[in-house]
Amino acid sequence: VKYKDLNGDGQIDEKDVRDIGYPKYPLYTAGMNMGFSWKGFDFSMTWAGAFKTSRLLSSMYRVPFGESNNSAVMKYMIEDAWTPEKGNSAKAPALSFKSKSHNYQDSDLWLRDASYVRLKNIEVGYSFPSSLLKKAHIGSLRIFMSGYNLLTFDSFKVSDPESDPSGTAYPLIKVVNVGLKVGF
């Protein structure tokens, strides 16, 4: 990894440090709810998104490129690592067993866009007509299927864009429910 002499004094030091990226908390958030019902069928969904937000990958994502070789290597680290064939098109430093502690210092190399759009909730259901339920002495009957966090569009790819960038938190789980609601 090469660092740029931003102030032009011929030295790479703390005077070359600059703010990079966007804040951890997004500058813009958005959400949208929609739904409809027709002849007993119903459908609803909720979308949410965050924009102009960045994550600086924590040491867990950088250590394999430095001097500590006791960490697992993730798929992106191998695919994106520098090789003579890739040259300047590589997105990550060369993997090495030698001391390369400068490879995991804070820099825009480890900065990722954490903007995303996520399908937070989707539900499809059917309510049976009361004329069919009277004989069974049932007031209402609805079957449904719902899902949470099933789809996310983002360029972060390393972990969940909503989770803590330290890599120590579980990502949001995907949930699918099937249900039956009976009223008497």
Residue ranges and their predicted role:
Residues 38-40, 49-53, 121, 128, ...:
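Transmembrane beta-strands of outer-membrane beta-barrel pores
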Residues 50-142:
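Extracytoplasmic gating/loop element in the C-terminal half of outer-membrane beta-barrel translocons
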Residues 81-91, 104, 150-184:
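C-terminal beta-signal and terminal closure region of outer-membrane beta-barrel proteins
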